[in-house]
């Protein structure tokens, strides 16, 4: 399902259903420009999500090629799962390097092993640990071998004919980044700010005091002029 949410620039929301998941769906956003396009987040790395996203892009007459860029807001599989689809066709991919490194580390199991060791130290029952690591975040993650253009807090990107500001908001993940269009006052919040549920704040072995960092990130964007989020 596609919905236009803003005109000049033309911004669309593609609903990507997440089968067998309590989150139900992901909103993938598309800025369609005259000389290029920007896709923000993808859905899981599974056929149903790929089909929904590709159908939406096809309806918008957007082809996966070098003039279409992909911005991954953070590493979670419902946002990054289909990054390989874009990278394989020459689309530039943008992502914060901290979250990208987590994806790389997860391939050899070191990310999950560090979390498992931490749970064991804290006394979590082994059966519960096993349940934690059989979730979809692991099953439907992307292959991390893709070229990435690293972005950092305060970076200004010119994509799809728009000037976008990168705002690093650690908390939900260490490298989560929002995108802001200052001229239009449009704010892509990703999972930093949700509307009817609260973001999950978990333990990260490379980021101490995740909840404190999240609250600081909320304060960081509190006074941002926003007409549409």
Predicted features and spans:
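Accessory terminal helices/loops
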Residues: 1-6, 109-113, 123-124, 219-228
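Residue-level detector of beta-strand structural context in well-folded domains
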Residues: 2-3, 27-29, 149, 154-155, ...
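Conserved beta-strand hairpin/beta-sheet module of binuclear metal-dependent hydrolase folds
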Residues: 4-60, 179-190
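Short Pro/Gly-enriched beta-strand edge/turn motifs at strand-loop
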Residues: 9-16, 135-140, 160-162
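Active-site metal-binding loops of divalent metal-dependent hydrolases
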Residues: 17, 42-44, 75, 97-99, ...
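A short catalytic or substrate-binding loop motif that flags glycine-/basic-rich loops and adjacent residues
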Residues: 21-23, 149-151, 170-173
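Metallo-beta-lactamase
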Residues: 37, 44-46, 137-142, 156, ...
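Active-site HxH/HxHxD metal-binding segment of metal-dependent hydrolases
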Residues: 48-49, 58-157
């Amino acid at each position: 399902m596609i919905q236009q949410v803003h005109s000049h620039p033309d911004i669309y929301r593609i609903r990507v259903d997440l089968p067998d998941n309590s989150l139900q769906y992901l909103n993938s956003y598309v800025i369609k420009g005259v000389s290029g396009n920007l896709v923000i987040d993808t859905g899981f790395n599974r056929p149903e999500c790929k089909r929904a996203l590709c159908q939406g892009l096809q309806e918008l007459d957007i082809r996966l090629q070098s003039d279409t860029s992909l911005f991954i807001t953070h590493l979670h599989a419902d946002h990054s799962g289909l990054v390989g689809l874009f990278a394989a066709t020459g689309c530039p991919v943008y992502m914060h390097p901290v979250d990208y490194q987590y994806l790389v580390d997860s391939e050899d199991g070191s990310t999950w092993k560090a979390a498992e060791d931490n749970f064991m130290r804290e006394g979590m029952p082994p059966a519960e640990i096993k349940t934690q690591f059989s979730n979809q975040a692991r099953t439907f993650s992307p292959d991390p071998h893709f070229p990435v253009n690293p972005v950092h807090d305060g970076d200004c990107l010119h994509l799809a004919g728009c000037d976008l500001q990168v705002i690093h908001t650690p908390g939900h993940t260490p490298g989560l980044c929002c995108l802001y269009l200052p001229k239009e006052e449009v704010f892509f919040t990703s999972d930093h700010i949700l509307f009817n549920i609260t973001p999950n704040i978990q333990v990260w072995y490379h980021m101490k005091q995740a909840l404190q960092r999240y609250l600081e990130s909320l304060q960081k964007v509190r006074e941002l002029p926003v007409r549409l989020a």
